[in-house]
Regions:
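Extracytoplasmic metal-acquisition and chelation regions
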Residues: 9, 16, 20-324
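Bacterial N-terminal signal peptides that target proteins for export
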Residues: 1-8
Length: 324
């Protein structure tokens, strides 16, 4: 993934690479000097974000369908081919797309420009509590898996991602650079407004109830932004493919019983069976609450877009933890 991060930084330095300027792989003639970019995006969440920037100005193909677990998703042969003919590929990074790393590397080796969204933000290590120390340069350079890839749970960090993507799109389509800058600035403002809205939604939760327990460690950035403490996760680490030991579960149940948690938050992209088992051990008064943390939701879910998803998650957290 280091190669892809360097590619993103080189792009922002206005160096021509792969599909930047001219007729790169998969380039499509545009109108009035603008290029109709062919953009491939890994996750449904990033797909919505990039789609907001590229609407009517490029074709955006999202590899992961709604509801797919980004930790385990693997590309098909046709999707691998789409990666290699794209003008621009947008990935999350930090090891999130581990099941498709080989296909992404192959596209980069073919000269396709691969931009890593996580390269535009300050990454946090797994297990950071509210108010905890930020990672230094040494921590950021550790092997993948140490840093948390779930950057999208913080809309302010996503605003920084949008600014970075705007620059990437402008470099790939310099004739219409101003269009990309304007679009990214407008969408960035929407995300900053969303942050204020979420803060207001969560205001009903008193400080003593700002504690999160999750199915897997997906809400570290959310906790950092909005002043929550992450008490623990049922599945260790940030990978939904991991499995807790009986001793891990017993220790977690003990901790949660002592603290008196109200809810366990489980993602919609993975089984909630373990969360339900823990809740049954804890007894009445504790519920499992489904959150959209790995994918957008389908029609009628309230999470059809990134903005809607974040609002819905905030409302569900507030409903579960708010009040006395």
């Amino acid at each position: 993934m280091r190669r892809r991060r360097v590619a993103a930084l080189v792009l922002l330095g206005s160096v021509v690479l792969g599909g930047c300027g001219g007729e790169g792989p998969g380039a499509t003639p545009g109108v009035g000097g603008c290029r109709a970019l062919e953009i491939v995006v890994t996750t449904s969440i990033l797909g919505d974000v990039v789609g907001n920037l590229a609407a009517g100005a490029g074709a955006v193909e999202v590899l992961m369908p709604v509801g797919a677990d980004p930790h385990s998703f693997q590309v098909s042969a046709s999707q691998a081919a789409a990666l290699r003919r794209a003008d621009l590929v947008v990935v999350n990074g930090l090891g999130l797309e581990k099941g498709m790393g080989g296909a992404i590397e192959a596209a980069a080796a073919d000269g396709v420009l691969v931009v890593e969204a996580a390269s535009f933000v300050e990454a946090l290590p797994f297990g950071l509590m509210a108010g905890g120390e930020r990672p230094g340069a040494e921590e950021r350079d550790r092997p993948q898996g140490t840093l948390d890839p779930h950057i999208w749970t913080d809309p302010v960090r996503m605003a920084d991602v949008v600014t970075g993507l705007g620059k990437a799109l402008a470099a790939a389509d310099p004739a219409c650079a101003e269009r990309w800058r304007e679009r990214s600035a407008n969408y960035r403002q929407e995300l900053l407004s969303l942050d204020e809205e979420i803060d207001a939604i969560l205001a009903v939760i008193p400080a003593e109830h700002r504690q999160l327990v999750t199915n897997h460690a997906a809400l570290g950035y959310f906790a950092d932004r909005y002043g929550f403490e992450v008490l623990g996760a049922i599945v260790p680490g940030g990978d939904t493919l991991a499995a807790p030991s009986p001793a891990d579960l017993a220790a977690l149940v003990q901790t949660l019983r002592r603290v008196g948690v109200r809810a366990i938050f489980a993602e919609t992209t993975a089984s909630a069976d373990l969360a339900e088992a823990v809740v049954s051990e804890l007894g009445e008064g504790v519920v499992v609450v489904a959150l959209f943390t790995g994918s957008l939701g389908g029609p009628g879910s309230g999470a059809e877009t990134y903005l809607a998803m974040q609002r819905t998650n905030a409302e569900r957290i507030a409903a579960a933890l708010g009040g006395s």
